[in-house]
């Protein structure tokens, strides 16, 4: 368990080791979250049947994590962090734009995840009754922050091992949850949930793509960059997709079965996604359930903290990686305290702000993945760190595509987390308005992806072919 001293540098050949299968654990650990059970209810909320929800969850999850897998290829081919490799697309200085947005998203979501773990602990222990809710939240907060800081600061080697244990513990405890609640599933009621039309299914599918895996694309190369360059590309993509997808798919499907069996549970989940799940449990299991809730959320927070530190370096802050992670961890700690104990009305607006940033990040993701797939060779190492090199200081084409994708994407999304975000959705009148059936399906994120994919392919493919000879 050694402190990692590598930062934005290309990993030396002598340090590259391991197999593609090692990617299973960090991605599984980041996605073994009880929130996936609640997502099953959200899928049914689109007005579709259980089987439609099942197919939407499987297809949406796999497609979104395929993008994460393709992004991981960049780390294997060039052995540098994601937001350093992004310089080849946006320019060494121009990359500060998507880099800074990614940094805000990382720090924001790690703060939200720790806050959710803290709040969930308090909610769960309210049912036990013998422990003060505030004390329970303090305990949950300390555990969540400690584990997140431990992994994020010490770095890659520790994360790869820690995520394995988090995955095994959380998966086993979640399996017990399924066993304890399986009698609550009424397959007659589940089968009776009416099917929705094609529009409703597509809306749920889009929700699956955007809500489960898409947000991890800008972290992917951070965890594959230690692999040898001769590692099978198919294996890198396959193990990433398998590790990230298998547990969320199972939990979403089971969550849909629970919600389809009891409409009141669906209503409760809408108000309290984690706390509502405790109503099905015996009291003796609640303490273990609290542990699952914390560990499941911490698995994602660890990856966010580690990647936020690397991204801070990638946008030009001249400090060591572990100091960057400590700095980000301090922001996370203070931010979580503020969200949980001070600002009662700030939590949802803050989430709304992060979701708003998700649209430009989606456009960036499409541009970056397209670039990775277009290139047959590794990125030029020296030019990634030289604004006068072949990648240049600023790629105006890529930045323009990102701006267009963001404008279109924001125009086709709704954000109800705060009144000051109501300006979004200014193009929804084209497809039925803010109250239409497409309004809450995140179709704007898909359009942002399409702009990124098509725009970069049309404007960069010929240049990349010429560049590679």
Give names to the regions the model predicted.
Residues 1-51, 199-207, 225-235, 463-469:
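Membrane-interface "cap" regions at the ends of multi-pass membrane proteins
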Residues 14-20, 154-167, 218-250, 265-275, ...:
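Hydrophobic, small-residue-rich membrane helices and short re-entrant helix-turn-helix hairpins
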Residues 32-36, 59-67, 102-113, 169-181, ...:
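Selective recognition of specific alpha-helical transmembrane segments in multi-pass small-molecule
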Residues 45-46, 73, 89, 97, ...:
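Membrane-water interface regions at transmembrane-helix termini and the short interhelical loops
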Residues 56-89, 99-114, 457-464:
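Juxtamembrane transmembrane-helix boundary signature
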Residues 99, 127-153, 168-179, 206-220, ...:
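Transmembrane alpha-helical segments of multi-pass small-molecule transport proteins
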Residues 168-193, 209-214, 253-261, 362, ...:
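Hydrophobic alpha-helical segments and their helix-loop junctions in multi-pass secondary transporters
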Residues 169, 365-454:
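C-terminal membrane-solvent junction of multi-pass transporters and transport-like membrane proteins
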């Amino acid at each position: 368990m050694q402190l990692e001293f590598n930062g934005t540098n290309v990993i030396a050949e002598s340090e590259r080791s391991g197999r593609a299968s090692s990617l299973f654990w960090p991605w599984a650990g980041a996605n073994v979250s009880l929130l996936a059970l609640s997502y099953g209810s959200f899928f049914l909320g689109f007005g579709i049947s259980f089987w439609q929800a099942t197919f939407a969850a499987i297809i949406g999850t796999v497609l979104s994590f395929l993008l994460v897998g393709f992004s991981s290829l960049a780390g294997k081919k060039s052995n540098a962090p994601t937001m350093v490799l992004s310089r080849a697309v946006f320019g060494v200085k121009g990359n500060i734009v998507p880099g800074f947005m990614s940094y805000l998203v990382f720090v924001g979501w790690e703060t939200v995840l720790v806050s959710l773990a803290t709040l969930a602990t308090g909610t769960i222990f309210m049912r036990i009754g013998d422990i003060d809710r505030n004390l329970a939240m303090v305990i949950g907060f300390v555990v969540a922050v400690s584990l997140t800081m431990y992994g994020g600061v010490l770095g890659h080697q520790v994360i790869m091992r820690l995520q394995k244990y988090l995955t095994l513990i959380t998966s086993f405890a979640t399996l017990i949850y399924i066993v304890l609640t399986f009698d609550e599933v009424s397959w007659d009621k589940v089968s009776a949930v009416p099917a929705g039309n094609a529009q409703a299914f597509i809306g749920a599918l889009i929700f699956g793509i955007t809500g489960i895996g898409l947000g991890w694309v800008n972290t992917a190369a951070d965890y594959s960059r230690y692999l040898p360059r001769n590692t099978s590309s198919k294996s890198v993509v396959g193990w990433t997709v398998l590790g990230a997808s298998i547990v969320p798919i199972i939990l979403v499907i089971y969550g849909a079965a629970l919600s389809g069996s009891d409409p009141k549970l669906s209503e409760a989940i809408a108000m309290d996604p984690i706390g509502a799940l405790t109503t099905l449990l015996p009291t003796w299991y609640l303490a273990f359930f609290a542990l699952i809730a914390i560990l499941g959320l911490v698995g994602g927070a660890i990856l966010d903290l580690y990647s936020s530190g690397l991204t801070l370096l990638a946008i030009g802050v001249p400090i060591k990686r572990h100091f960057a992670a400590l700095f980000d961890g301090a922001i996370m700690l203070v931010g979580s305290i503020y969200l949980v104990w001070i600002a009662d009305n700030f939590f949802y607006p803050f989430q709304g702000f992060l979701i708003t940033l998700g649209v430009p990040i989606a456009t960036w993701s499409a541009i970056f993945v397209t670039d990775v797939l277009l290139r047959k060779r590794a990125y030029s190492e020296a030019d990634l760190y030289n604004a006068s090199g072949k990648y240049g200081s600023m790629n105006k084409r890529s930045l323009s595509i990102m701006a267009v994708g963001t404008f279109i994407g924001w125009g086709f999304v709704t954000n109800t987390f705060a009144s000051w975000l109501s300006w979004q959705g200014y193009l929804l009148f084209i497809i039925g308005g803010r109250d239409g059936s497409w309004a809450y399906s995140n179709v704007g994120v898909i359009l942002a992806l399409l702009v990124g994919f098509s725009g970069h392919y049309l404007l960069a493919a010929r240049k990349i072919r010429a560049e590679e000879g």
